[in-house]
Amino acid sequence: MASIIRVTKEFSFEMAHALWNYDGPCRNVHGHSYRLFVTLYGNPLEEPDNPKNGMVIDFSDLKKIVKREIVDVFDHSVVVSRYFDKEKTDMFSALFGNTVLVDYQPTCENLVSDFAGRIARLLPVGIKLHSLKLYETTTSYAEWYAADNQESASSDLEFGVLKVKKNQI
């Protein structure tokens, strides 16, 4: 039955952030209840003696990856860009404790792109990341699709979460 199947798992976490150099109220530290939908695709396993028979991925295995790479890192944290001056980032750490510094402006759009890289690199062979949907509020979200990013993956080199164009090196 070699059908390609998509499977999706939902995760939630609480996170605060501040947008460096932003001209609106989101420049202030504020928080959201995020919801992340992770969609993978692949062929269900066809090995009758394997306990994972019939699965694209065991949802508990996907949960372990996302929990370790996303939820445990970002839940109940304050996320700020390294672009803030060191005095401010030190202050965030002193005031809030769990502060995560990232190499980008921590918008919903940039977060979902970062999360895609963190998840995709850990998926088992034969299973691919199809898409992510990150809700920042009940009515606002950003989406990442593998199909939309195939061309850019060959023209960009990734260094952590900071992307540099080949012609900029």
Question: What positions do the PLM features span?
Answer:
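Charge-rich, low-complexity N-terminal segments
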Residues: 1-169
